[in-house]
Structure formats: C-alpha cells, structure tokens
Amino acid sequence: VWFNYPPFKTTIVQEFGLTPAQAGTIGLCNVALTVPARIIIGMLLDRYGPRLTYSLLLIYAAIPCLIFASAQSFNQLVVGRLLMGIVGAGFVIGIRMTAEWFPPKEVGTAEGIYGGWGNFGSAFSAFTMVIFGVALTFLPGGFNFGEPETFKILFFPAFETPVLNWRMAIAGSGIIAALYGMFYYFNVTDTP
C-alpha cells in the first residue's frame, strides 16, 4: 500500500489538474512522516511486540488509502499521503521479527533477503496496481482518458485501456491490507 500512488501519478495529475510542484508534494508526503513514525513504531514494538503492532499498522493502512481514494481536492490528497507515510514505518517491524526468528549467524542473510524483497515490492506494485485499476473499471470512480492510453510496465507487453479506476485500486489495496492485518494477528506469533 505504501507504493500505491506512483503507478497512478500521471492519471491523478491529469484528473486533478495538478502542477508539477503539487505532484511532487504528494510524493514527498508519502515519506514525510515515515522517519518519526519508525521511532514510534519501534517504541510500540518494544512494548507490545511485532504481532500486535504489525496487525494494527496493516489495519490502519486502510484509513489513508480510503482518504486518498475518495479525495476531491489537492489538500485531501496531501492528507491521505501524509497519513500513508506512517505505514512506511512497517519496515521496522520486519527487522525486529527477522532478528527474533533467525539464529544470530543467519540474521544478516535473512535481513538482506527481507530488505531486498521489500524493495521489490515497489516494482511489483507498479505492475499489479495498474492491472488492479484496469480490472476494477466496472466499478464507480473510473477515470476516462477519452481515448485509449498505452501502459508499458517493466518487461511485460504494453496494453491499452481507455479507463483506469485508480480510486478503487488504492481503496482496495487498503482493504486487502486491513484484512491481512486481521489474518496476521490470528496466525502469527511474535517468536517461533
């Protein structure tokens, strides 16, 4: 969910008539609260453990997604992305869990894999979020380009679509995160 804005940036800029500075502000807001949030999440981890902290963070992720997806103004987009920056603090939880779930001689490798696959998430979301947005065009909120737009994502074949439902895709990613947060709470333990 933290990476769900960039795949739709061009569409959102076009729909809202944003200036380049406004588009950049929205991107900056996505990380603006991440650093202080990582400190707060770290303190919550120490007090409540990774299972509860991560579950609540995933459930919380639905809130900024729904705010951003239902935005009607630049200011509402900014608020949604600022609140989304807190979700970026989830990285801290994975570091802690990796350290607790693996023996000391394997923690470095495990955290390297965790960090590497975490970065892969940004590239993967560029593909999946657009596909999700196209698949949800039958729902209200689709943005009509007026004529087909071509999308080329990574090494996959280009495709064209006249409609892209970025709002439902972003809202849907938040809802999926919240559902996964509930699943996580009932199926994961803090330590092995």
Locations of the language-model features?
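Extracytoplasmic
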Residues: 1-20, 125
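Residue-level signature of mid-helix packing/kink "hotspots" within the transmembrane helices
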Residues: 3, 31-39, 89, 123
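Conserved MFS/SLC helix-loop-helix module at the cytosolic interface between two early adjacent transmembrane helices
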Residues: 36-75
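A generic transmembrane-helix signature of 12-TM secondary carrier transporters
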Residues: 58, 62-65, 80-81, 174-181
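Cytoplasmic helix-loop-helix junction between adjacent transmembrane helices
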Residues: 80-117
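Glycine-rich segments within core transmembrane alpha-helices of 12-TM secondary carriers
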Residues: 109-140
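C-terminal membrane-cytosol helix-exit motif in multi-pass small-molecule transporters
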Residues: 134-137, 174-192
